[in-house]
């Protein structure tokens, strides 16, 4: 019996729930901005006028004063041309964007982000 391949939304939901449950200190700092799906022309124009931008990564994670983007894809999924363009804009502005294909890959990147912030030297002014 073969298992059905996991969809992008299933991978994303598993990753988000893992972070939410494993690292409660990140709650409110990891979120999804709905910017995809099918809409009628009027709703699409309203969303675009209010700031919805195609190609934004699926998950935005804020930590230690930095932003990170996570784009979820299946094993055979590809980044669209508009996603590639937005990812390059973010990266050229110092915002890393990771394309992840599993919850485990997401966990790895989050672990790296959290541990690098934890190992950062304290540069705050004490006693000034």
Task: List each language-model region with its residue ranges.
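Catalytic phosphate/metal-binding cores of nucleic-acid and nucleotide-processing enzymes, i.e., regions
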Residues: 1-128
């Amino acid at each position: 019996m073969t298992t059905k391949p996991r969809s992008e939304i299933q991978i994303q939901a598993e990753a988000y729930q893992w972070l939410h449950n494993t690292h409660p200190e990140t709650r409110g700092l990891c979120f999804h901005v709905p910017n995809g799906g099918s809409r009628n022309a009027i709703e699409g124009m309203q969303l675009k006028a209010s700031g919805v931008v195609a190609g934004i990564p699926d998950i935005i994670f804020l930590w230690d004063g930095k932003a990170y983007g996570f784009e979820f894809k299946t094993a055979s999924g590809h980044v669209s041309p508009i996603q590639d363009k937005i990812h390059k804009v973010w990266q050229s502005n110092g915002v890393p964007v990771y394309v992840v294909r599993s919850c485990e890959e997401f966990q790895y990147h989050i672990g790296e982000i959290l541990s690098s912030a934890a190992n950062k030297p304290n540069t705050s002014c004490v006693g000034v």
